[in-house]
């Protein structure tokens, strides 16, 4: 699956959240740029930002915090041995296509709730 700049994606750990946590957009991100080359190694990266703030359960993420992850890891499948109860197939999956960056002040006004997922066969 390929994403575009500004797409909203969810991390597979979204499935582990309570309904209340899901309302806070935890584990939802917006892709800012890819591919981006690491200046030292030449490795291709995805640059993305958090659409939530969370400082509990071993998480320390600020709203709008920027992350970089190698493309190969970003597009990798979920390790079903380590996470046997996860139904999502890939580490990140598309929620919504967007045409521009969502600014932090707009996040609470956007409907970012993922649609209900059909069970994988």
Task: Give the ranges of each region predicted by the language model.
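A generic structural motif
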Residues: 33-38, 52, 75
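Short beta-strand-centered aromatic/proline hotspots
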Residues: 18-36
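Short acidic, Gly/Pro-enriched loop/turn segments at secondary-structure junctions
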Residues: 37-43, 81-85
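Residues that flank catalytic or metal-binding motifs in active/ligand-binding sites
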Residues: 5, 27, 44, 88
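Short solvent-exposed strand/turn elements
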Residues: 39-63
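Conserved beta-strand residues within beta-sheet cores
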Residues: 6, 28-30, 68
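Intrinsically disordered, low-complexity, charged/polar segments
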Residues: 55-121
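Short coil-to-beta transition motif at edge beta-strands of beta-rich domains
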Residues: 1-22
């Amino acid at each position: 699956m390929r994403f575009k700049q500004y797409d909203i994606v969810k991390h597979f750990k979204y499935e582990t959240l309570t309904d209340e946590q899901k309302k806070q957009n935890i584990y939802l991100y917006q892709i800012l740029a890819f591919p981006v080359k690491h200046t030292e190694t030449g490795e291709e990266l995805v640059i993305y930002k958090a659409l939530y703030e969370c400082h509990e359960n071993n998480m320390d993420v600020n709203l709008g915090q920027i992350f970089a992850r190698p493309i190969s890891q970003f597009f990798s499948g979920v390790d079903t041995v380590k996470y046997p109860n996860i139904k999502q197939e890939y580490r990140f999956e598309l929620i919504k296509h967007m045409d521009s960056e969502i600014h932090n002040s707009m996040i609470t006004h956007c409907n970012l709730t993922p649609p209900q997922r059909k069970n994988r066969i």
